[in-house]
Amino acid sequence: MKPQLLLPLLLAALLPMTASAQSGEGEFPDLFNTSAAYDILAVFPQADKLAEDPFFTGTLGADTLFLDRAHRIDSVVRPSQLCNLYSLSGGSKDDPEQVVEFFASFDPESLPQKVRGAWIDEICSVRDELSYCLQRLAQAGYAQYWQEQVRPCLNNAIEQYRIAPEQLGAIHQEITRLAGGQPLDATGSRIYILGNIDNAFALLDETFCCTPLLLDPETARQYRIDFMQVYIHENLHRLSLSGELLDMLQTLYDNDDFYRTHEDRARAYGEGGNEAFVVAAERYVSRRLGRIDDKQVLDEFLVYCDGTHVLAPIVYRYLPDLRNGESFDGFLRRLFDRRIRPGNRFGKRCERNRRHRINAG
């Protein structure tokens, strides 16, 4: 693709689009859950703060080796990677001891080939540090600490949050529509509210982890983000994307300077690759459900990761063309074939349309 083609296509895609949807219904009991197992894996970015807690005086607070190794872990892997790996084990989400046992005996060769990759190699590079720190946390009474000090705060945040079942039903109706023929769990993604994270991330077993900060209306208003936005976003990660589509994305990266420059910046945030597709789909679903207006759609594209997801507004612009029964993956492959593939002239037409709108305005 000629480098100049993607930019005008992006500019044209930023024009407002309205959408609507019918609300659905559904029952989603036990939407929120807690997990001592995931929380113990998420402590490393906050190791210094944890060691200073009076509960750990004389144990972690006096163990400089623990802190040194925790810092090493934090510099190499993210909590989302550790939680994702443990999610594949089938172990208890409530028992930190099972986490200790899993990482002490973990064999990367036992993993399915499809989940292996650089992230597993990164975890393996700090296996000794992980084993030591997890054992020290267990010995210092982390399970008791979590029950007494972490869990009550999480339960309070959960109890204060209110959501209507019909809202969840409408969301999952939209996600099922985007899935095409792909089967999805009818009750949606299980949500773990963790005390040791300040973000949200999806897990490979179609569940996801979320900070309790997103359940607080005041925090949501302050940072212009709310739990339902994150819930939609993370559930959209359940949609399958084919190797063929990812190859198309790589071809674009290899052949388009404009896209490559922005994609490199997105990757620096840890949000590259197919993340632009999910961002576009979240805005599309939220707009169809009437949760946001056109200005909020545009604002998200401009500010999310500093506007680096240049494909997101293009995908959003054409999502209304999703065919009946077509999967999100099928739609994206068709979009690449007809609109973003190398050599097409759509970008030039979009540039002419954009200039016409500017002159008319």
Show where each model-derived region lies.
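Bacterial N-terminal signal peptides
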Residues: 8-16
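Auxiliary, metal-adjacent structural segments of Zn-dependent hydrolase domains
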Residues: 150-205
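Active-site scaffold of zinc-dependent metalloenzymes
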Residues: 112-117, 172, 190-225
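N-terminal mature-domain "stem" immediately C-terminal to a signal peptide or N-terminal signal-anchor/transmembrane
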Residues: 22-107, 305-328
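Post-HEXXH active-site segment of zinc metalloproteases
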Residues: 242-270
